[in-house]
Regions:
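Short, small/hydrophobic-residue-rich motifs at membrane-helix boundaries and re-entrant hairpins
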Residues: 28-51, 60-61, 65-126
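Alpha-helical membrane-embedding segments
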Residues: 80-97, 169-187
């Protein structure tokens, strides 16, 4: 069984120790958040399971790893994006007469069904991509990010319910931090930008530890 509380605590401590007093590292990571492949590349290094935050050197390698990690996410998201375009652009949804109440009701039902399908697909992609990214980092093999059988097997060892609940806990924490920042007038966006490195370190370490819980001892 996954100890989400312990993973949460360890991830906070990891992010705190990785940035506390290291203002040069913090500033470099803030800049890398703007050049997002760099930050993804840094998260890629955290995914490898290091016990301390990795050094922010070899920017070319980080950029390359970040691009590859982005491509993994894009490849998994592409079917959902294509399905969204196909379903919402279908003639039945576009060409509905506003004078026909039955047609309008049918349109509403169709939109609801399509939305449910897309939400389910997006959630499934998120669940798979999360483990796929860590697997890619651990094996250093791009093709392993698409080894669906092993990815599903790994999540099954963690336990699907534990896996989903743990990721939801991480998402809730990140949402709370974001909302607190955004409700602060004027300075909120600046504060959120300043906290992005902490949030990135926290979430990538959290996912890495969650992945470890499904690794055979």
């Amino acid at each position: 069984m996954v100890d989400s509380g312990k993973i949460l605590e360890q991830s906070f401590r990891y992010a705190k120790e990785g940035l506390e007093g290291k203002w040069d590292t913090w500033m470099l990571l803030i800049i890398s958040c703007i050049i997002f492949p760099l930050f993804l590349g840094y998260m890629f290094r955290v995914y490898r399971g290091t016990n301390s935050s990795p050094p922010e050197d070899s920017w070319g390698g980080m950029f390359s790893d970040g691009i590859k990690l982005f491509l993994v996410a894009l490849c998994y998201a592409l079917p959902v994006l294509i399905l969204e375009v196909v379903l919402f652009a279908s003639p039945g949804l576009v060409k509905t007469s506003p004078a026909n109440p039955g047609a309008i009701m049918g349109l509403i039902i169709a939109v609801l069904i399509v939305s449910i399908i897309l939400v389910f697909g997006a959630v499934l992609v998120w669940l798979i991509t999360t483990t796929a990214g860590v697997r890619f980092a651990r094996t250093d093999n791009f093709s392993e990010a698409f080894n669906i059988r092993e990815i599903i097997s790994h999540i099954s060892r963690i336990g699907w319910m534990d896996y989903i609940v743990s990721l939801l806990m991480m998402l809730i924490v990140l949402c709370i931090i974001t909302i607190i920042c955004l409700v602060i007038p004027f300075a909120g966006l600046i504060l959120l930008l300043a906290l992005l490195p902490f949030m990135g370190l926290f979430s990538s370490r959290y996912v890495s530890l969650l992945y470890d819980s499904g690794t055979p001892q």
